[in-house]
Amino acid sequence: MQPPPPLYALWAKAGVDQQGVRDALLGCGFPSASHVDGTTITNNDYARGEQCMLGKGFAYQERHTYCDAHPHLAACPATDGAAAAGSRQHPPAYEQWTRPDADAQRVQQAMRACGYASVIEPGDDMLLNDIAAAQLCMLDGGFQFTLPASALLCRNPPKLAACRDRVIDTAHCCAPPRAAGQR
């Protein structure tokens, strides 16, 4: 498996050399012209950077931009709201947490208190490390994750600073593992 190409290799504009592409990427808010991921940029900021590059006349060399794949993002140009809402293929994030004494409103309040920027789609506006810290806060608050433990960020690489080598009681924190293909 080949590593992904550097970010600057995915953009082109007539008369602009590689250094010009790198400078434009940094000018459009990308933290690096080579490689970015969820630990360095949010989904919305990535989409905003792509829109900036397109606005400067650069052409994206891959098949689809981030907004093509994620039209619901606030940074993406206005689209048909129904189509954008239909592009989500999973329930809102607040449905991923439960506690016997907490209704949906209390879950959402706890999520906000734990630092979630959104109770619907936190990945749009939060870095992975911040989501991991919020997940740990929810577990500390006695909430159970309704997805398998493997979906917790502190159970998957990359090692995030927020995880602090914490051991999570996977037998009690989360829903049981699912068989392949099971929803």
Pin down the residues of each PLM region.
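Mitochondrial intermembrane space
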Residues: M1-R183
